[in-house]
Design a protein with these regions (language model features):
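Conserved pre-catalytic core of RNA-dependent polymerases
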Residues: 2-144
Length: 144
């Protein structure tokens, strides 16, 4: 798995997708799935998930465990599962967190593996949707 320059390669991919979507608003993207399991996209997704920290999911595997296994091997395994159509998300770990009024609300914690795949999917589809959003719309948008 080649991870050199992943941030720049991902930025170029996103820019290309954005410009294509912006140029032709009626354009439909039918082949984004293969972008999700690109080496650079998965590595960038890993870096973003790692930066967010967070607890392990139902599998009990945390960031440190993945680093001990070997990041390259872990991401290569995810890539193979995605490419072969074998990837299945795990159930989320349910924990109750306190609210200001003293009651509790449920929180679902996905596995780190699922968070990596979710982030990779976000990296691939975000520029396509970003091209259609209005400039006056700010909610949950990067750098807005």
């Amino acid at each position: 798995m080649q991870t050199n320059n992943s941030k720049e390669k991902v930025r170029q991919l996103q820019n290309k997708l954005y410009l294509t979507a912006k140029k032709c608003a009626s354009r439909r993207f039918h082949a984004l799935y293969d972008k999700v399991y690109r080496d650079d996209v998965l590595f960038e997704a890993w870096k973003r998930v790692k930066a967010n920290k967070g607890s392990s999911g139902v599998d009990g595997i945390g960031i440190e465990d993945i680093e001990a296994i070997g990041i390259e091997k872990y991401l290569t395994d995810i890539k193979a599962e995605l490419a072969d159509g074998r990837y299945k998300p795990s159930p989320v770990k349910r924990v109750m967190i306190p609210k200001p009024d003293g009651s509790k609300r449920p929180l679902g914690i996905p596995t780190v593996k699922d968070r990596i795949v979710q982030m990779a999917a976000k990296i691939a589809i975000e520029p396509v949707f970003e091209a259609d959003f209005r400039d006056c719309s700010y909610g949950f948008r990067p750098k807005r």
